[in-house]
């Protein structure tokens, strides 16, 4: 039982490390989008920042922050 719990904890920690260190570009639904940081970081906290017309959004599935593929906020 303790071994199973230990393996589960290690798996969760490694999954979080992977999500935080995910590459800057990712393909979702066949579209290439630019990720912004990852983990708890928001787009404006660090490079790469979203272009001014694209909103920073959080992925529902992975929790990673990324630039929206839809243009909005344009003046």
Curated annotation (Swiss-Prot):
Keywords: Disulfide bond, Secreted, Signal. Residues 1-19 form the signal peptide. Disulfide bonds: none annotated. Expressed by the venom gland. It is found in: Secreted. Residues 20-31 form a propeptide. GO terms for cellular component: extracellular region. The keyword Transport does not apply. Contains 4 disulfide bonds. The keyword Disulfide bond applies. No toxicity is observed upon intracranial injection into mice and intrathorax injection into crickets. This is U14-hexatoxin-Mg1a. It comes from Macrothele gigas (Japanese funnel web spider).
């Amino acid at each position: 039982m303790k071994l199973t719990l230990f393996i589960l904890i290690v798996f969760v920690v490694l999954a979080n490390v992977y999500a935080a260190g995910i590459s800057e570009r990712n393909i979702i639904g066949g579209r290439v989008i630019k990720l912004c940081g990852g983990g708890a970081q928001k787009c404006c906290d660090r490079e790469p920042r979203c272009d001014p017309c694209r909103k920073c959004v959080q992925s529902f599935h992975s929790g990673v922050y990324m630039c929206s593929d839809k243009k909005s906020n344009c003046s």
